Amino acid sequence: DCCIIAGCPFGCTICC
């Protein structure tokens, strides 16, 4: 999902 791709350990709403 986008969180993994963005390298962000938080929710997609926060990261993306």
Curated annotation (Swiss-Prot):
The answer, when asked if Secreted is one of the entry's keywords, is yes
Q: Which cysteines are joined by disulfide bonds?
A: C2-C16, C3-C12, C8-C15
Q: Name one GO cellular component term.
A: extracellular region
Return one GO MF term.
toxin activity
Annotated tissue distribution: Expressed by the venom duct.
Key words of the record: Disulfide bond, Secreted, Toxin
Record localization: Secreted
Specify where it is mainly localized: secreted
UniProt keyword annotation of DNA damage present = no
- What superkingdom heads the lineage? Eukaryota
Q: In which family does this protein belong, per the annotation?
A: Belongs to the conotoxin M superfamily.
Q: What is known of its domains?
A: The cysteine framework is III (CC-C-C-CC).
Name this polypeptide is given: Conotoxin ar3e
